[in-house]
Amino acid sequence: FLVSDSTGETLDRIYLALKAQFPNNNYKIHHFAFMRTTTQTATLINACKKTENPIILYTLVEKQTTNHIINECKTYNIPCFGILDYLIPQFEKIFNQKATLKPSGQHELNKEYYRKIEAMQFTLQHDDGQKLDTAVDADIIIMGVSRTSKTPTSIYLGERGYKVSNIPLVLHQKLPDEIFSSEAVKVGLTIDPTRLSDVRKTRMNILNDKQSSTYVDMDVIQNEISEAKKMFVSKKIPVIDVTRKSVEETAASIIKIYEIEKEKKQ
């Protein structure tokens, strides 16, 4: 049972990280979002009592609701774990100030929120080589041949407040010089040719495309990747191999490169 006093997004991510360490356990997930009253906790506990071997994970900051769940769990011998219960008191000591204990604090409509909205709008407008004339205004420019996860990686970064432009590299087509001279941090994505061929074949099958034979031709793919690598080297663009990387891992590597490059310019 994933219990939160807000949307539950934070708890979902924590649970996925935890679940990955125990791949053989297939628990059914029950979401209880916006949990802020004892009436709601009663519904939660009743659901737990009807479930075999229930476990509660929660991110709650309001003490009355939290204490009610803890007491009920003790009564009915239900394991429950508060993700923030240990961290908040420790950070209060470190910062020498009391926590606000305000639910949904991370979702306030503040400057940071609107900055992320602006970043996402920019990223969507500059997807797949669109608006090259303003791509130079990006924080990050991602380049790579077709099907190297440029779009999902860009969107992931956009959600985190980075303005991203992603540009497909096409054989025998040069990019404007302004792209390389811009202040944006440039990152190249590459991939194993065999893996790329498989990805493209899957894409063609989904689209029922029988015509684009060169799109999956191994010689063409190897040439595409080779030319892209040469360009990355000549322009001194750091490269990430996405063959065995998830979008999240690729994005984390890009953020690291971004931070390093920004430090160099300070």
Question: Language model features by range: what are they?
Answer:
Residues 31-50, 54, 59-60:
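Metallocofactor- and cofactor-centric catalytic cores in central/energy metabolism, strongly enriched
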Residues 123-127, 209-250:
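Small-molecule kinase domains that catalyze NTP-dependent phosphoryl transfer to phosphate-bearing small molecules
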Residues 153-155, 169-201:
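Redox- and metal-dependent alpha/beta enzyme cores, enriched for Fe-S-associated oxidoreductases
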Residues 117-163:
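Internal active-site segments that recognize and position negatively charged phosphoryl groups
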Residues 1-18:
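N-terminal accessory targeting/assembly segments
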Residues 3-6, 58-63, 244:
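Structural motif
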Residues 186-223:
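A glycine- and Lys/Arg-enriched "phosphate-lid" helix/loop adjacent to the NTP-binding pocket
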Residues 1, 74-115, 218-224, 230:
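Ser/Thr/Gly-rich flexible loops in soluble cytosolic domains mediating phosphotransfer, phosphorylation
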